[in-house]
């Protein structure tokens, strides 16, 4: 197994400076081109039989088609909805344009599974959310003081905001982590934080 951390490569660039963010938003950055070139070099060097893509925002349809034409099976797991983008981190055109290139999609959502099968005619399996952390990290987490609140990690959309506000209305305290939640909810029982990644999620 060889890991190719495309998303982390992008984050390292994007969050390094405000200039990088501006360059990317103005479509003047070459970071995605660099990531895709490195992806092709990596695939060429290890010649895998399968590639599992997490979400796929950084990989272009052209790069995926190149891999597919080499006989490599492409599998996608997207923890967000590939048809509804609730924020800049939840999806982009690379995801929607690449849907039919994959040999298999894993999704957490029954409606998404149905749409992938019926509209795009692609093989799809349901894979609920799950986490597997190291014993070392588990032991660190055990030593932390327990916080008796609901915790939600992810970017907002109207449905998520409505559900979270409904919980807050009945007296449940909630910590929310993600981008732009201030534009969706405002409640005394809800505390909003910036996104967290990797081990910081725990």
Sequence positions of predicted segments:
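Histidine-anchored nucleotide/phosphate-binding helix
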Residues: 63-68
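Structural motif
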Residues: 49-52, 73, 104
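Nucleotide-sugar donor-binding catalytic core of glycosyltransferases
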Residues: 1-21, 30-38, 55, 61, ...
